[in-house]
Amino acid sequence: MANLASKLQPWWLLLVIPFLFVSNTYHCVNAEPQVPCYFIFGDSLSDNGNNNNLATEAKVNYWPYGIDFPKGPTGRFTNGRTMQDIIVQLLGFQEFIPPFATSRGQEILKGVNYASGSAGILNDSGQHLGVRISMNMQLSNHQSVISTIVEMLGNCAASKLLGKCMYAVQIGSNDYINNYFKPEMYNSSHLFTPEQYAAYLIEQYSRQIKTLYNNGARMFALFGLGAIGCTPNAIAVHGTNGSACVEKMNTAAQLFNERLVPLVDELNSNFTDAKFTYLNPTGASAANSLGFTVANASCCEIGSGGDLCIPGSEPCGDRSQYVFWDAVHTSDAWNEVIAVEAYDSESKAIAYPFNVQKMAQLPNNNDADGDICEMGENSGVTV
C-alpha cells in the first residue's frame, strides 16, 4: 500500500495540527479547501453520528468502532475514517464535516453530513432495523440547513455559497441489502425483476438529485454501489455456490450502476450550469495487489446472525490487511483506496466523466455570475 502514502500523510494529524500538508501533491500549507463546503447524503458508509440517538439497531457508537479514530467511537461504521472523510481531507478541509445531528452555528457553512445508517433511496428500506433518515428525509434536513444559512448570510450570498459547494451522494445499498434481498420482510422482489427494480430506484434517485439542484446545488459527486455480494454477511447469509461472492446481489447492484452512468450524461446535458460525475467504488485495483490479505472476513468479532461488531470485543491486530471491518462495512485502509481512486483516477471506469479533483477545479458558473446579487436580496435560493 506504499503507493497511497504519497497521497495522504498520517491522517490523524488532521485533527491535531492545523494547516498541514494533507497531500504533498495537491495542497499547500494554509491553502483553502478546493471547494468552500461539502454536503454528504447517504447511508452507513458515510454516517458519522446521525444515528447515535435514534431508536435503531443500526448504530455503532461503541468500542471497537473508532479504535483507530482519535475521538474513538463517533458513530462511524468503521475502525477509522469513512470514504467521505478521506475525500474531505484530499479536498483540503482542516476538519471533518459534522453530522447533521450535532452541527451548529458557523460550522454548517463548511457543509453538513446527513447520512444515516440503514437509510435508502426508498423510504421503507431498512425499516426493520428501526428509525433511520431516508434520502427524502435527508433532503428535508438539508432544506432546514439552507434556511439557516439564508438567515446567516442573506439569500443572495447563501445562493452563491451553495452553488460552489460539492454534494456527495452515496446511497442505494440498503435498497438491496435491507429491502430487495429480504423477501420475507419486503415485497419489492415480488413486484419487480432486478432490471425493473434498478429502473425504479434510478427514477426515484433522479428526482432526489433534481431536488438538490433546485435547492441550489451545482456540483454533484454521485457514487455507485459497491460489490454488495462480496461482504462477509452476504456470503454467510446467501451462500456463493462455489463463487467468491453472491453473484445475484452483485449483478443487481451493477444494474443500478449501469443506469446511473446514462443518468449522469442526461443531467450534464439538461443542466448545463451544473456538473455531475459518477464514481464507481467497484473499480479499484484488486485487494491482494495492494497488500490486503483478507478480503472475505471481518476484522472484528460478529455476533451470531448479525453484521456489526460485538460491543467491547477485541478486533484483529493488523487492520491494514483487511478489506472489511465488520460483516458489511469496509475498513479505514480500504476506504482510503476507494477514496483516492475517486479523487484522482483517470480511468473512466472509476470516475466518469471526471474525478473529484478535476470537478473541483472546473470553472464554476457562480464565479462569473456575479450579477445575481445585483438583482436584489430576493434573488437566489428558494426555501
Residue ranges with predicted function:
Residues W63-E203, R207:
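Conserved SGNH/GDSL esterase-like catalytic core that processes O-acyl groups on lipids
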Residues I171-T282:
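Extracytoplasmic, non-cytosolic globular domains
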Residues C37-F41, L45-D47, Q84-D85, K110-S116, ...:
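Structural recognition of the beta-strand scaffold that forms the well-ordered cores
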Residues A55, A227-E247, T251-Q254, P262, ...:
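Mobile gating loops/cap/lid regions near enzyme active sites that modulate substrate access
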Residues F39-I40, N50-T74:
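Peri-catalytic substrate-binding/gating loops that frame the active-site cleft of hydrolases
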Residues H27-E32, T102-Q106, S147-L162, K210-N214, ...:
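Surface-exposed acidic, glycine-flexible loop patches that form ligand/cofactor-binding
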Residues N51-L54, S125-L129, N179-P183, N233-A236, ...:
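Short coil/turn segments at secondary-structure boundaries
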Residues M1-V35, S347-K348, Y352-V383:
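Terminal membrane/secretory targeting segments in land-plant proteins
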